[in-house]
Amino acid sequence: MPFRETSPVAERIALMREFETGVFSVTELCCRHGISRETFYVWQPRWVSGEERWFEERSHAVACCPHATDGRLAERIIAVRRRFVHFGPKKIKAWLEDESRRKGDGTGWPAASTIGDILKRAGLVEPQRKRRRAIAQGEVVAPAHAPNEEWSIDFKGWFRTSDGTRCDPLTITDQASRFLVEVRIVDPTWAGVRYALERVFDDIGMPAAIRSDNGTPFGSTGAGGLSALSVWWLKLGIEPRYIPPSSPQDNGRHERMHRTLKAETSKPPARSAAEQQQRFDGFRRHYNEDRPHEALGQKAPAQLWQPPARTFPAGRLGDPWYDADHKVRRVRPAGQIKWRGEEVFIGEALAGELVGVAEHDSGGHIVRFSNRDLGVIGRDRRFLRFAPPRARLRVASEAPVTVEQ
């Protein structure tokens, strides 16, 4: 004999029909059906009321929630998300609170978690693949603590616009404030980058240091890691700082900005380079003025950044100054200097520049450009780049310096 199949609805109907006969007491009915008296008195009034579908489960949700988000606030949250499609709940909350402060309307906005729930219900949140964190390796460059203490510079990976034009976006950010100083399509050569930097320096001023990778045109494998571009930085009094090779995590703030730049301006690319540059200009304004950053206390970069105090010098740059105990040599066009009757190769990036040569405790001679040590000329007259740690140079009294061509 097969088992009798039943359901909660069928059991409720049978319970009330048996109760209607008057044969069983309430206690007996509850024992027969395996329910409590409290459950019986939940269903009995519904059966008596004559409701058409009294036997169905009802929603247990509260009829009214006094702390539910006002519909107008939810609509405003959704509108901000549609305007800034890459803003998450925290940025939306910060942006709305800043807007309320400017207007002085005193609106209280819900928590970021509630905003996230509102966006999910509106179908505005897509599940994202979790990114595996990279393991940091090597020496990490110390972070900047004040605006213009250090800028970061790099090229965002090149791509082509719809008409086939190649775009190489040069990006510059301030490390401390995250301020996006420039996004400009330039020729990826030292001359192209120098021209773009001259415009920036002349417009807003210069930082104390610039952080970059050691690739062309920012650095090289030559003496001191210098390139023609970083030699120019040193002459301007800007310290070149290089992250270790294959260590983009040491420039993580800049790389994170690149992800946002790509998502909001080049997916898909514009029709032409001119139109793409317009997108970059619009993104720069939005990134600096509208987009809150969690690391900045949900403030926009423009609220923290201020123009540099150092101005771009006009006219020809002067040669570096060296202590009196240095022999000064002019680097020839092919990268050599004349040292004790022989030509010693230093580096083509320094062609035409003055370098200083001073005695070293090891018996050799240390070579430097400005305040950057380049290497050591050994007793065999060979130049060794990136020499081992060395003793501090002796500081002599100031005296006239002669230049040997």
Describe the role of every protein-language-model region:
Residues 1-14, 63-71:
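Short, Lys/Arg-enriched anionic-surface-contact patches
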Residues 7-24, 74, 78-83:
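Short, amphipathic alpha-helical "recognition" segments used to contact nucleic acids or chromatin
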Residues 15, 29-30, 40-43, 51, ...:
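Mobile genetic element proteins and their domesticated derivatives, centered on retroelements
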Residues 45, 51-152, 158, 227, ...:
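Basic, flexible linker segments flanking DNA-binding modules
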Residues 68, 113, 117-174, 179, ...:
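Mobile-element integrase/transposase regions
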Residues 188, 202-222, 244-246, 251, ...:
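Acidic/histidine-rich, metal-coordinating catalytic segments
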Residues 222, 228-314, 356, 360-361:
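Charged alpha-helix within mobile-element recombinases
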Residues 288-405:
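C-terminal, beta-rich DNA-binding module of retroviral/retroelements integrases
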